[in-house]
Amino acid sequence: MENQTLAFAERTLRDHLALLPEGWGRNFEIATGLSGGGDYSYRVRDGKARFTGSTPGNVLLGVYDYLRAIGFVFLYPGKGGTYVPDLRKPEDLEAEKKPFTASYAHRGICIEGADSLEETLDFIDWLPKNGFNAFFLQFQKPDIFFERWYLHTYNPSLPPEALTRQQLDGLDRQVEEAMALRGIRCHRVGHGWTAQALGFPGTGWHKTDREPEQKDLVALVNGQRRFWKGIPANTNLCYADPEARKRLVDQVVRYAKETPGMDYLHVWLADDFNNVCTCQDCQKTTVSDQYIEILNDVDEALTQAGLPTKIVFLLYQELLYAPKAARLRNPERFCLMFAPISRTFEKAYPTSFTPVEVTPYVRNAMALPETVEENLTHLYNWQKIFSGDSFFYDYPLGRAHYGDFGYMKIAKTLYDDIHALKAFHSNGYMSCQELRAMNPTGFPNYVMGLSLLDETIPYETMRKTYFSAMFGPQWEKALSFLEELSSLSSTDYFNNHGPRYRPDLAQNYGKIRELAGNFQIPEGENWEDLRFHCRYTVLLSGALEALCLGKKEEADRRFREFCAFIRSRELAQERRLDVFRVIEVAIHYTGFTLPEGE
């Protein structure tokens, strides 16, 4: 029986070659197969093309590597996102790659934001084009991300469309099928286990007016056992309670049995901090020690069930602090995931590192670490007790990127971060991010994928390749403009690092507003998207300028103007900008306010 991914790889090659002028390559004799040498290799010569890989998914990655080698550039997902080279001679199609092994084994993206089925499928199709090999569907079902789009949260100008359970299950199934077709590794769940253990759906950060039926299973916080801020997924359990732990473990085993199509199952605790249990028994240990014991229970239960499920565990918030006594009994089942959600993106990871003193942990009075050095010291402490498989789980395109109006600063930070991973014994990187983080360009995503695939590609090479394909002969004009915007931007300010009153930054935002307002835009499709970005930048930088000067009323008025503009353009810019997410981050982190109902 023919493997669907190998067949897809051959079809992909033919489809792309058919786009070339003169139809060169349409009659190629194409062969695909599996081999043990590296991740993939290929040879295209004299009308014959041979692609081999260690897995069918790696064969597809080899096909895209070849297409990039002959001049294709995959700028962003969906229609119009592929640059087709102008090749005029058959020999232009000849290329060879000896057995190649990717620089990092884990190269993935985690779903965030508000997502339609079409945009999600386009994104999954785009992932292997730039070297990614994994996609993470958060929660037991990724309902929350689809609901945000179809209900048009934060955009009252579009009619909401409620989805049934059957429809949501269908969306999840189509996404999983698209991943399987391309040989993309499937990661699932993460948060939500605590909600499931209490009898509530683990499908998002949904609020409830109901109280937990068995309150004794819920963490005791501020003298009460109740849902944290009304959200079951953000609520910790009383992990000293054997019944609470058993319920959580049973949910993990049930899900593992019912979901055979995944490659990695993430087992995390609640998605908030300073809300762990303060009962007498829980205070005898640390939440990290309790977490390790829960993971050991999960391993034992999966072993008894005969399930080889790979479990990903999380270093995040309270769990950044290494356990004092507990240790994993079967470390081979586990993969460590380091998630420094509170770090700055104004500074990249260093390639050499000396641990620093970390702030002592105080139960439910923790301040999240912002410096790169303190976050990395937590990782260093965990690595003293776990030396197995691991990857970084980071957030450059989750919140901070909205503060970089040119996307060039965040792209370079990404590049430098990835080139530092091996200094921390990491096997890769997964970005928790909006799928539509493409405004003004998809360059940060492009840099991320190709750097993880092949760390030898220079940043300058990627920059020239991407921008010349995106903007044509005047690409340097676009690059210079975006570089200047980035030089004046602050990812930290938008991400709520530091005081809101910043007259020094206000000057920068004034310059950004002037630059974007005066930029002369040539004709062309991608240039038209840059025209939208200029107006976007004028409005948002104006709101930020007022906020930095302490003019809250004016800042909110300007922010409402910005929201009205992007809402009115949402369908036209759907592939590039997540309107829900930029508004959500601006309200919950940056400091803007919208009137209720807007």
Regions found by a protein language model. Give the residues of each.
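Contiguous, structured surface segment used for ligand recognition
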Residues: 1-103
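Aromatic-lined carbohydrate-binding surfaces of glycoside hydrolases
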Residues: 33-36, 48, 56, 82, ...
